[in-house]
Amino acid sequence: DMLANYREVGAGMGATLSIAIEMNAYTIADRSTWIAYGNKQKHSIVFEGDPPLFNQYGIIPVSPDKCPDTHLTAAIKVSEWMLSEKGQQHIAEYRRHDHQLFFPNAR
């Protein structure tokens, strides 16, 4: 049975990495958590770069009709900045342990 060794840990990515390392097991993790995580022992990335693993982030201002406490003007300003050339540059330059964490692709 393929799922015989499957474990659902019900925790965040950092805790999941800790459990996988403690069990000497495999897990799927996002790159930024993997890079930021300090206790990797001898574990390493064994597979990466396949398009189905692409973990894209998006930004969507929330409608004040649905969420009355939303600050729409501020949300639009943040969205526009993140999608701007300067925002995309800042995202691309954000690094941890000398590794780029995010790869902006706004069009």
What is each stretch, according to the model?
Residues 1-107:
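Exported/periplasmic ABC-transporter solute-binding proteins
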